[in-house]
């Protein structure tokens, strides 16, 4: 059974998963171009964070950053290595979409990298209904095409 816990950054397994996520993204991105948030960055009031557990094992996590009253951005979406390649990424995305709807978010966006490392994430986001869009919020278009900016509208 899938269990969701909001804001449990201090759980050692969640902390380790996020730490690994930060390291991987920084290593896979051109220097100075990452927009990944560390744990203090995820703890700000405009961000909600959830970890998802399957039979008491950490499956993954993700966050929703409020850009304004009805526009949210997904951040720090990561599936635990033990749950990868088993269609669990879609469970994390679907959970975040449900939470966003509960919070009256009408538009969702995701920023992700354009390199080979990010191809599985782009495939997951595209399969979830996200489509490319121009840069949003504080993001800028960059010459090395680091950003892919999909957006979906919630009805």
Identify the function of each model-found stretch.
Residues 77-84, 114:
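A short, internal acetyl-CoA/4′-phosphopantetheine-binding micro-motif in the GNAT/acyltransferase core
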Residues 51, 57-65, 73, 78:
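Conserved beta-strand in the GNAT
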Residues 1-12:
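Conserved N-terminal entry element of GNAT/NAT acetyltransferase domains
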Residues 115-134:
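Conserved active-site alpha-helix within GNAT-family acetyltransferase domains
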Residues 83, 87-95:
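Conserved acetyl-CoA pyrophosphate-binding loop and the N-cap/start of the following alpha-helix
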